[in-house]
Amino acid sequence: MRNQVTANKDTWNTDSDGNIRLSTTKNFKEMGIQQADTFAAMEIDVAALDSVDVDIGANSDVSKKIMNLSSQIKTPLLVSGVQKNTYGRQNQAILFDPQIKQIYTKRYLTPFGEYIPLRSIAEKVSKYTSQVNDISAGEVNTIFKIQDAKFQSLICYELIDDRLIRQVESDFLVIQTNNATFGDTPQLDQQLNIARVRAAEISRYLPYVSTTGVTSFIGPQGEIISQVQKFEPATLFGEVAKATGVTYAQKYGRYLEFIAIFGSIGLLLMRRKGRR
């Protein structure tokens, strides 16, 4: 069986009072209503990282609007944003169907971007450090369930963490990211290419969804199946096939690193010994 996924590049920009701006929301909702039959055939609609730029838990109006949209298009919605709870501020991927069904909390945090390493020392170096609130990391490897398929989501730079990649055993992997901070720089293509390598490494389809970067459907050999251009709001429809098990790269890849390191050391020692 094949599963259909929608990668949505629009973001849910909101005012400070939690209301979604009509210009963006109106377009997004009209797109959903006008293509209701197409969305109904989808098994999930995925929005980019920070697609909701307010705390969903603290803004019930925003949460209700997302639930209403999911109900209107008859499709689960995977959105993301920062929420505050008993653990502090957390970066999360949230599945609506149409109510909140499952939540994944980002486990690998980006140094200086999401927390300040060695904070006590950093605060002595820069007075602005104290104004930065650390984000709290999650601990659970959430496996989302939609109809007869399962998938995992990694957020932004989590895709560079080998430990998290080794844990991917679901049918496909979703990457939600926000490249807006980097503007039109090589970083946009760099992160996409890392995702392509990861898709080949785990031999799975990988919907890659970015706010401003190159939103793409990536095949299990790292090939680009379809994509939309940078900075262009768009909805990308595609199909992904389910995969099972783990690859040799996931299972034994870590050992190759040690073999390469100690092998190189051994060759250097042998070379030095041969010169004597």
Name these PLM-found stretches:
Residues 1-276:
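Enzyme catalytic cores with a strong preference for nitrogen-chemistry domains
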